[in-house]
């Protein structure tokens, strides 16, 4: 294990001490109906109310004694000098795939003219409309500029940023800086790169177990830390098996303390985009699960022996498998929506299974999932309920919207 790392996350349920969020910003107001699919949204949240809901989420965490960090502030603090700042701007522009030379130059001039680091970061997150740039003559435009003349953005917004779980994942004392499923979201990982390279507190101090330069895809919603010995990973719409193999080899080689990984293979669709949308740990011996995945679920145990991954498909009951790997007598799987197929489908769509555990048996949930919440309370769990009518439009819940930096050991 790495004693000097400022990251310490060896479970899903240990008391949460420090967490990173992103307050939704102007990037949400750059959503428009014609391009929702391109930006991985199904609807457009009302920003003012989404911010109120997110502020209440952050305050609920603070009321539980949790220190709240913000991605946008950490990113701004990472631009520690002019050289780093310029490198960030150039890398941001390069990853936006702007092909028109004149357009690229105009964007660079705009960003370089922003003196305040926080304002710069916020602008890169919000995206840049073509109307914000000086008029460029047809002679100076590249072919892409002319072909996409009706498209309103010179650089797309990043509206998914408030789902901080996905661009990178904290695992033990390390971090997985992910290569994401879509080009739209993959640009988000640039902020993590600069935080873990240059930030005064985190830069160069956290072991990397996966790098964003890889060409296979993995996202944080598919990376769960069940205990100091066992990880769970999802093979899903957003994460492929090749990435998981790379991640696990790095984790085992860097001796972060983990002995086994359970790999969950389940339906590949947007409804079940990540493992944590259908399966989360809420107590020492309790998990939420969406009943629709149970029939087709396949689980593989992965260990590392003689410098090779050893992979075995597990057969039998999931609850028994989890109990054996967690060292508890029995595990209870709490089904989202109970036994009602309509309620289960509705509440899973509204992230009833996507809970954030902030201490053993203490769980942050959306208040709208009344059936699932009543079941959780009947099992003895204490729920911290938050409003999410606007936040949920992005298809993510409390776990999706949070990245733990520090938890107490269990």
UniProtKB/Swiss-Prot annotation:
Keyword Coiled coil included in the entry's annotation: no
EC number: 3.5.3.6
A Pfam family recorded for this sequence: ADI
Primary site of residence: cytoplasm
InterPro entries: Arg_deiminase
Alphabetized UniProt keyword annotations: Arginine metabolism, Cytoplasm, Hydrolase
GO terms of biological process kind: arginine catabolic process to ornithine; arginine deiminase pathway
Reaction equations catalysed: L-arginine + H2O = L-citrulline + NH4(+)
GO cellular component: a single term: cytoplasm
Enzyme superclass (EC): hydrolase
Annotated Gene3D superfamilies: Arginine deiminase (1.10.3930.10), L-arginine/glycine Amidinotransferase, Chain A (3.75.10.10)
UniProt keyword Ubl conjugation, yes or no: no
Active site residues per record: 400 (amidino-cysteine intermediate)
Positions in coiled-coil regions: none
Subcellular location: Cytoplasm
Record pathway: Amino-acid degradation; L-arginine degradation via ADI pathway; carbamoyl phosphate from L-arginine: step 1/2
Entry GO MF terms: arginine deiminase activity
NCBIfam families, A to Z: arcA, PRK01388.1
Similarity field: Belongs to the arginine deiminase family.
Protein name: Arginine deiminase
Originating species: Streptococcus uberis (strain ATCC BAA-854 / 0140J)
